[in-house]
């Protein structure tokens, strides 16, 4: 049975939505959970019937969002440190955390270690597109500054994830740039273009709109651009939702029409909501770590756990190592 460590104290809203998500996941599938945190705060939130599938690991500290990522390495009593140590010692198959993403990434990289031939791990996230599907984008925050070889490795890892986890038989990989032509981009992206061209899956440069039109399956960029893209997309989706609500309320006819469109709005909300996707895997480490949104609700945590189970049941890390070995110097 898959065993997952969950940082029960991470996230913006405390343990309540995290524990609720764990319970919802246990209702739907079989796995063993290790909840890391303050057991006195956690246990009262769990129905007794689920306790047989849950173990507890006491952690006295929590890494706050205001702290630096490197500070986490010194905080050995923190919930995320202890969760990562379980993965390092192979006592669990995966870690899920909605806490400090920088701390989670630093600990996973330095304590669990990287896969062979991976210079830097990357955070990969799914974004909705107009084809009623998703586009995998990486990196979305792990690496602010990248060299061309890092972007090439992201492309290999993204392609492998698309095949193994998303079941895309022939994924199309694009390099995010300011134009489709090979001559577009900065010096790093131009160098990366030459490297990524070695992949049969590479379809060339991709512009920002292609993240959402379904023309590519994997978008590669550095973490600085990727994080801005992610946060901007979240902001636009939220703003459009609010604009629609305000406009509907201004007209009785629009209100009547919105009732008829309720199913459409529900489907749209489901497609663009982050909680449908759960979290973002940290690709390139010697294990499975899912980084969830700090504002994760119970549904997001549940789906992050499902993500972790799928990852742990796959051969994705082996595939990444094998693919990168073909290009090792």
From Swiss-Prot:
Protein localization: Cytoplasm
GO cellular component, one term: cytoplasm
GO molecular function, one term: phosphate:acyl-[acyl carrier protein] acyltransferase activity
Keyword Iron belongs to the record: no
Enzyme class: transferase
Keyword set includes Kinase: no
Pathway: Lipid metabolism; phospholipid metabolism
UniProt EC number: 2.3.1.274
Reactions listed under catalytic activity: a fatty acyl-[ACP] + phosphate = an acyl phosphate + holo-[ACP]
Record GO biological process: fatty acid biosynthetic process; phospholipid biosynthetic process
Function: Catalyzes the reversible formation of acyl-phosphate (acyl-PO(4)) from acyl-[acyl-carrier-protein] (acyl-ACP). This enzyme utilizes acyl-ACP as fatty acyl donor, but not acyl-CoA.
Subunit field text: Homodimer. Probably interacts with PlsY.
Family matches, as HAMAP family: PlsX (MF_00019)
Annotated protein name in UniProt: Phosphate acyltransferase
Source species: Campylobacter curvus (strain 525.92)
């Amino acid at each position: 049975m898959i065993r997952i460590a969950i940082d029960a104290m991470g996230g913006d809203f405390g343990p309540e939505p995290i524990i609720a998500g764990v319970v919802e996941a246990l209702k739907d599938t079989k796995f063993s959970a290790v909840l890391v945190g303050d057991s006195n705060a956690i246990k009262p939130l769990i129905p007794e019937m689920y306790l047989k599938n849950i173990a507890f690991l006491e952690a006295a500290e929590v890494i706050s969002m205001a702290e630096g990522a490197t500070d986490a390495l010194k905080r050995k009593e923190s919930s995320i440190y202890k969760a990562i140590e379980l993965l390092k010692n192979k006592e669990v198959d995966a870690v899920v955390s909605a806490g400090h993403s920088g701390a989670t990434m630093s600990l996973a990289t330095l304590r669990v270690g990287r896969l062979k031939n991976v210079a830097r791990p990357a955070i990969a996230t799914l974004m909705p597109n107009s084809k009623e599907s998703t586009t995998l984008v990486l990196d979305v925050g792990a690496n602010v500054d990248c060299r061309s070889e890092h972007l090439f490795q992201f492309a290999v890892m993204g392609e492998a994830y698309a095949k193994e986890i998303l079941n895309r038989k022939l994924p199309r990989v694009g390099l995010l740039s300011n134009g489709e032509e090979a001559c577009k981009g900065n010096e790093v992206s131009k160098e990366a273009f030459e490297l990524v061209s070695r992949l049969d899956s590479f379809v060339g440069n991709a512009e920002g709109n292609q993240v959402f039109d379904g023309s590519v399956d994997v978008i590669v960029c550095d973490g600085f651009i990727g994080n801005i893209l992610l946060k901007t997309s979240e902001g636009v989706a939220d703003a459009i939702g609010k604009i629609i609500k305000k406009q509907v309320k201004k007209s009785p006819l629009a209100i009547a029409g919105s009732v008829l469109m309720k199913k459409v709005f529900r489907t749209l909300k489901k497609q663009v909501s982050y909680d449908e996707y759960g979290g973002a895997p940290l690709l390139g480490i010697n294990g499975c770590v899912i980084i969830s949104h700090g504002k994760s609700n119970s549904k997001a945590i549940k789906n992050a756990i499902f993500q972790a189970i799928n990852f742990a049941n796959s051969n994705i890390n082996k595939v990444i190592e094998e693919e990168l070995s073909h290009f090792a110097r």
